[in-house]
Amino acid sequence: MDLINSVLNLFVPPASLITLAFSWPALCFPHACEWLYNTVYGDNMDGKVVIITGASSGIGEQIAYEYALRRACLVLVARREHRLRGIAENARRMGARHVMIVAADVVKEDECRRFVNETINFYGRVDHLVNTVSLGHTFYFEEVTDTSVFPVLLDINFWGNIYPTLVALPYLHRTNGRVIINASVESWLPLPRMSLYAAAKAALVNFYETLRFELRDEVGVTIATHGWIGSEMTSGKFMLEEGAEMQWKEEREMNVIGGPVEEFARLMVAGACRGDAYVKYPSWYDVFLLYRVFAPNVLNWAFRLLIAPQGTKRTSSYVGTGRSLEGRPMLEAPSPRTALLAPYSFSGGGQLS
């Protein structure tokens, strides 16, 4: 067996690369034709039903507006019902056929069943399920002394997407519908100070990749990954994907290149309606895939030099509307080093990337 593996290790990689190099144009042509066809004849969302979790602000809010422009019927789900009322009114003015708001916590399976059942009872169908809830953090893992929020991070970033999908799938099968997931570039490009978030997003992406195979073509899956997004990053502020405005503080400045939440939401909805398997924004992040595969040491050096250099104080946090989660303590590290979670609201939590 060792001999067989040695032979395969020697011949399979170069043979695969040569085959891919020659077959790449042939593979791209049908994909381009399919993309053009779906752009022209993609899903017409007029009157169709879309459930959006984490809809009270940020990406979830902007996605609601994009579907409203397409005259869809919306079900807006979040914990902050008072925020949903204003967004629902805006969506109606923008063209939504009808808007239902539901206060629910998507990390609880019974509440997911409740809002899906309410959707079916009222509309009789579900065409798209858009999961946007997330919770980001910034801390060095080895400095954490209070681990009580670890399960919360994983519940929100993983189970907060899985439970709604599980409950909605039987109804999505009936309409040949689609599940849209708000993932992140950290799922394949993990960054320092975001260890648990990156792990949860990687698990999420791999879950939906597997689910895509299981569902075949009966229910579509669109995985949207984004890098830094925001509207005020040049002034040191950025809009978290679920809407809480935060201030990035660090003992040295960090320059960030990103894009507006509105643009990501527009691309995400357009890609879902075309039936795209993936939506990436900004697309230039793809270059890091090459480094990840062929030169991983370059990324390691870059992170050490640019993000977490030796000799720099590890004092970084999000400040703004942050508070404890459900009365639970925030993550703390030995003074003066404090690692804070971005604010949690199950209209979604705050998330950085």
Curated annotation (Swiss-Prot):
Residues given in the record as NADP(+) binding sites: 54-80, 105, 197-201
A Pfam entry, by short name: adh_short
Cellular compartments per GO CC: cytosol; membrane; monolayer-surrounded lipid storage body
Parts of the chain that traverse the membrane: 10-30
Swiss-Prot/TrEMBL keywords: Lipid droplet, Membrane, NADP, Oxidoreductase, Signal-anchor, Transmembrane, Transmembrane helix
Gene3D superfamilies xref list: NAD(P)-binding Rossmann-like Domain (3.40.50.720)
Span(s) of short sequence motif Proline-knob: 13-26
One MF annotation (Gene Ontology) recorded for this entry: NADP binding
Domain of life: Eukaryota
Name of this chain's protein: 11-beta-hydroxysteroid dehydrogenase B
Encoding gene (name): STO-B
